[in-house]
């Protein structure tokens, strides 16, 4: 019950996950993972299929995990989120690592043209 409360779903304790919304299912998955007391949690595009409001809820849960010291490896296009919570960022393009470093280095002084183009597109779209 404590873990469901931690992800904001204490009121859903008697429901099957399949009866929950997509965002709620994501949070149930996080609670299930936390029940194993992991050293590291892996996330693969945790907000990609969610509307922005629900995606923000997932990011808030992940931010709390980071604040509590959870090590996470996150594959994401949510660059604003990565910039705020990451200790290190790895930029991949077409299956190849193009750059890695601190968020400040990656976002303030990109070295490769691919990363420069990616960040420029995000800025133009208002997503960073």
Regions found by a protein language model. Give the residues of each.
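A short, surface-exposed alpha-helical micro-motif characterized by mixed small hydrophobic
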Residues: 82-84
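Catalytic Walker B motif of ABC-type/P-loop ATPase nucleotide-binding domains
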Residues: 41-44
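H-loop/switch region of ABC-family ATPase nucleotide-binding domains
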Residues: 76-77
């Amino acid at each position: 019950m404590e873990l469901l409360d931690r992800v904001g779903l204490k009121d859903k304790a008697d429901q099957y996950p399949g009866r929950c919304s997509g965002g709620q299912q994501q949070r149930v998955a996080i609670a299930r993972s936390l029940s194993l007391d992991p050293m590291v949690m892996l996330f693969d595009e945790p907000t990609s299929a969610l509307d922005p409001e629900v995606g923000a809820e997932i990011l808030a849960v992940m931010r709390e995990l980071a604040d509590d010291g959870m090590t996470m490896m996150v594959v994401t296009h949510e660059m604003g989120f990565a910039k705020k919570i990451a200790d290190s960022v790895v930029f991949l393009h077409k299956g190849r690592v193009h750059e890695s470093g601190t968020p400040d280095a990656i976002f303030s002084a990109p070295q490769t043209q691919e990363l420069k183009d990616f960040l420029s597109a995000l800025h133009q779209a208002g997503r960073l």
